[in-house]
Amino acid sequence: MNHHEVHAVSAFAMSGFEQSLVFAIDGGGDFLSGLMAVGSGTVIAQLVSFPEHNSLGLFYLETIRYLGCGMFDEYKVMGLAPYGDPDRYRELFAQFYELLDSGGYRVHLDRIGPALLRNIQVRRKGMPFTQQHRDVSASLQEALERIVFHTLRHHRKATGMTRLCLAGGVAHNCTLNGKLLYSGLFDDIFVQPAAHDAGCALGAALMVSSELGRPAPRERLPDVYWGPDLGNEQATELELNAWSGHLDIQRSDDIASSAADWMANGAVIGWVQGRSEFGPRALGNRSILADPRPAENKDRINAVVKKRESYRPFAPSALEEDASEFFELPDGTRQLPFMNFVVRVREAKGNVLGAITHVDGTARLQTVSRKTNPAYWDVINAFKKRTSLPILLNTSFNNNAEPIVQSVSDAITTFLTTDLDGLVVGPFLVRKRPASLQDWSALAASLPPYASLHRVRSHIAPDRQETVCEIRMGHSAHSSMRISPELFEILMRIEGEASLGSLFDTALLDQAKREDLVKELRLVWELRGVRLHPLHAACRHDNVQSGT
């Protein structure tokens, strides 16, 4: 099996189609950058493959390097593109690719850098985006769409296939997918929810299963809630109670109504239920949720929770049965459960949905079915009863330093290190409480597996060096954070598991210094340079016995 073949299987075998065109397209793998095939029954017959030097993924990546972005930042530029005008650099981008006969194309990756260096002010990471950068983003997105449409039109006509499956990293370009949806080129489109390389594992497993005589049922994939389960209620409550100095915890007999009350009154909350999602999207089990109406909710979540660029859009989750009232869905389209398509917000509703309507009047919609996720459907429906709006703002439950939360522990950590107003875990409503120095001192500190302590000589001026202390994240000195010598010494004392209080006692620190170190630790914890967590029960008992 090869890279793009398993991409193709991951989409076609989950689509529910008996026959379809299958387009797998990404940055590269096994010296190719994609393939076009026809799926029929349990067989996928390749029509054409695309060499790595014609990679559309690399075409996108090579361009965004000059916008201060790197690998895996493609989605940021996709979100920036609607702020730009593609006319400005259309002729420039026309030099970077050719549309060939029979649906072929040629990409000139070597022309991109020199041309952009001559024509734009290159952006460094962290600098503001200018209108020039927005226009480059728009031209890039338009060029990608032109190439993909050119290829698909040819193969649609040549094969007569009326359905399409998409996989590969480029298939996560939701703007492109939305254009395909509205084009009418295909009667139905299925995009593998884990279109990136994680989906290759699924495709490989499906291929082997089919070869062993156990092909996947020809059914449409209903959901991807395949990750770790939250656990039983008793275990969840025990874990929450271990943070009792930091959290107020209340069990609700109607968690959907309680959460909806919070959001209807302006709260931005973490929502954690059941099994986590497979793939890159939070689809209602590991989500940050909020009222989709106030535009300031978008600004607030970007600034104080996600701590990311202010232009970045948020997605709506809408009840499946009500979605068409608020969004322009093509005829026959009712279910969009995986946030794979950007769709138009109805003009009359755009002003109402200020937090989820992008600058071009679109949104990356998730429709929610009562059958596939009853808990999430219930909370949206409860919000509808209070506001007449069957929609919530939904974004992944994480900060800018970590992936999406999985466990109760992850959820608590992210809740305590962001400005979320509340947390819902299973049937429990959780709020923050002001923690005392004693509460913080009762926690244990440890270094994550990817972090290490270093004391190094560093230039603080061209002619002056001094010794500095830092935590390195991974193996690169470029991914490091400076810490005080006092915190360095405390972290160096960690052996096994001990409370911060006992470490402070060993270092003979006064109260003022302890307060300073707790404040610094909380900042480092927010960036995941250290872990703070309750002591295990046995260790808590030992510390009580020793008087700490």
From Swiss-Prot:
EC primary class: transferase
Enzyme Commission numbers on file: 2.1.3.-
Gene3D superfamilies to which the protein is assigned, alphabetical: 3.30.420.40, Carbamoyltransferase, C-terminal domain (3.90.870.20)
Family statement drawn from the similarity comment of this UniProt entry: Belongs to the NodU/CmcH family.
One protein family per Pfam: Carbam_trans_N
Annotated source species: Bradyrhizobium diazoefficiens (strain JCM 10833 / BCRC 13528 / IAM 13628 / NBRC 14792 / USDA 110)
Disulfide bridge partners, by residue number: none
Gene Ontology BP, a term: biosynthetic process
Domain of life: Bacteria
Function of the protein: Involved in 6-O-carbamoylation of Nod-factors.
Annotated keywords: Nodulation, Transferase
Protein name: Nodulation protein NolO
A molecular function GO annotation: transferase activity
